[in-house]
Amino acid sequence: NNVDKLNGDW
């Protein structure tokens, strides 16, 4: 899932 990379900035 790309969600991990998107949430990585948080």
Curated annotation (Swiss-Prot):
Keywords: Pheromone-binding, Secreted, Transport. Disulfide bonds: none annotated. Transmembrane segments: none annotated. GO terms for cellular component: extracellular region. It is found in: Secreted. One of its GO terms (molecular function) is pheromone binding. Binds pheromones that are released from drying urine of males. These pheromones affect the sexual behavior of females. Belongs to the calycin superfamily. Lipocalin family. This is Major urinary protein 2.
